[in-house]
Swiss-Prot record:
Species name: Antirrhinum majus
Protein name: Squamosa promoter-binding protein 2
GO terms, biological process: flower development
Residues reported in the UniProt entry to bind Zn(2+) 1: C85, C90, C107, H110
Intracellular or extracellular location(s): Nucleus
Amino acid sequence: MDPNMQNMMSSYLKIKKLVGDEGSDFEEEEEGEDEEEEEQERVVKVNFAESQLKKKKLNLGEGSGGKSGEKHTASGGGVVAQPCCLVENCGADLRNCKKYYQRHRVCEVHAKAPVVSVEGLMQRFCQQCSRFHDLSEFDQTKRSCRRRLAGHNERRRKSSLESHKEGRSPR
């Protein structure tokens, strides 16, 4: 079993142990300040543990959805997506690649390629947006879309003008 999955399962079992078998017997409990405080403490611990478990699931890529190409976990609870390149007919396994490529679901080759086919459209990966755009959004062979390059150039011009005003030479 995957170590992360094993860790999640042990967290789940701890939560289950905290909650115990008290599911529907809450109304039959004796009323007393000590017991109420203990119950409140238990609820806080369970809520905290559940939130930690949800965070772990999200960090592992589990959550909603059940697309093909994903594997189900042993517990049957969530789905873990196999990281693979979005480019058609690529399917490169990104598990051994850098986190950047896993996060954006593109292999290193296609991140730098001038033209790729994604969802039937000829596109290019923008290194500024970290997304695929139509080729019409790029100038010649540049890897950043016009919109992001315009913003970058504007910031450069602005800093250059400010340095002239202060009497410094431009960079």
